[in-house]
Amino acid sequence: MSLAIAAAQLPGCTMDLAANVGVAEAAVRDAARRGARIVALPEMATLPYFCGDAPGPYRAWAEAADGPLAHRFSALAAETGTAVFLPFYERDAATGRYHNAVLGFGPDGVALRRGPVARKLHLPVGDDPPPGFDERAHFAAGDALHVVEACGLRIGVLVCYDRRFPEAWRALRRLGADLVIVPVAGSGGDDMDFFVGEMRTHARENGLAVLCANKVGDEYVGGGIVDNYGYSAAIGADGAVLALRPRQEGPGILLADLDAAAIPEVRRRLRYYDDRRQDLFA
């Protein structure tokens, strides 16, 4: 079964939040017109990356998982017949905490789970992201991984920095994932061979396909500039690059055909997950 999957490589967001939402919606429609069944958007898809500033001024941007942004993209998923993965700034009314989170909607517009499909687990501070950016001042860390079903695939999500941790990939494989979506707001001059190669390695080691969506270009917030480097990518379960959108190609849709039926065959051939020494490793 071949399935068209898409990553929306969005331009850097502005302080005009309504305009940012419009850009993201247009990208989903564009991907759907090109035949995509699954569309991934970048980290903080409709907001500039504000973690270089104090959190106070930006709290008003946060929304509940069933708030206005969720309703808009639920309707958009149903309109386009695509599964949509939307990163957003979450305010959890039950706990009062704020999260860097992701919503998922099926092609019928129904939420793929009650609440977010992912909350960022690892919150960076220091050099990744660049110096001066502190996510721990803005967000509470998530405490669980989830796998949801859409378009015949079992899908997990690792938000940006979460991709750095091999245990997270292995845990998603253990939970039955076929595809891992990686929304990124990537900046700071990362080595592009490493950026893509790291995900290729995790894909091959675990027999997991990968769909990574990054922003590209400058974002201006709080007097600072965040320079997103693009390189959205689709990667097969064997680690092969199916599609890549480098920085110089700018904003646009990365589209790839994922052969879901090939994933079990890859796992039979590349037995790294099955051959691991569980008697030695937790």
Residue ranges and their predicted role:
Residues 8, 118, 148, 213, ...:
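Hydrophobic residues at beta-strand termini and immediately following loops
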Residues 2-13, 119-120, 153-162, 181:
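Active-site-proximal beta-strand elements of phosphoester/diester hydrolases
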Residues 17, 22, 26-112, 117-119, ...:
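Cys-nucleophile CN-hydrolase/nitrilase-fold catalytic domain and related Cys-dependent amidase chemistry
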Residues 112-116, 242-243, 254:
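A structural microfeature
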Residues 62-85, 154, 163-252:
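CN hydrolase (nitrilase-like) catalytic-core segments centered on the catalytic cysteine
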Residues 86-87, 100-104, 146-148, 232-234, ...:
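Short beta-strand scaffold segments in enzyme catalytic cores
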Residues 261-282:
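A conserved C-terminal secondary-structure "cap"
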Residues 75, 92-175, 188-197, 201, ...:
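Active-site catalytic loop in hydrolytic enzyme cores
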